[in-house]
């Protein structure tokens, strides 16, 4: 019922992180014009890595194709025919996806296998300048390890809607202007709420 909302929120985080919109917005609201400080990156022509190729991952691929991107995905259980139909290259190794993708978006369930999957070791394999989006589940990414990778300049930025502990009012990511954060708003649209109500009533 909320797959469209969740997908659109992940795309919103990707776009706002790529163009540093919240940080730019904040400086202008402080009545300072700092145009030269905010040089973003384009999505056009880039490689997008989708981790978890279920309903939302597939929808994300479908939407991002409009930006003329190359899309790769990692999911051991992926529907190969659907991937081919969407023009998505499936990779068998998550490390390969991390080393090739300019943007990584996570669409995994939270399971014993996926908790902490994005640790310091995996993040070290990321392509330099990568942006990571997590609008799936909290706890899949080690937030401290990601904050360290961003501070070192290896990872450019991140967009996060979910956190290891929720409600979350303190994370190593909150101190970084390169990170865009929202309080688990993936399903928070009028339409998703309406559909959820209809589903319950049915």
Protein language model features and the residues they cover:
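C-terminal helix-to-coil terminal segments
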Residues: 1-9, 39, 157, 162-202
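Phosphate-binding beta-alpha-beta segment of Rossmann-like dinucleotide-binding domains, i.e.
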Residues: 1-47, 59-62, 66
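Glycine-rich Rossmann-fold phosphate-binding loop(s) that bind the pyrophosphate
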Residues: 53-54
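Short, structured coil segments at secondary-structure junctions
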Residues: 67, 86-87, 175-177
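Short beta-strand "acidic-cap" motif of Rossmann-like dinucleotide-binding folds
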Residues: 71-73
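Rossmann-like adenosine-cofactor binding region
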Residues: 76-172, 188
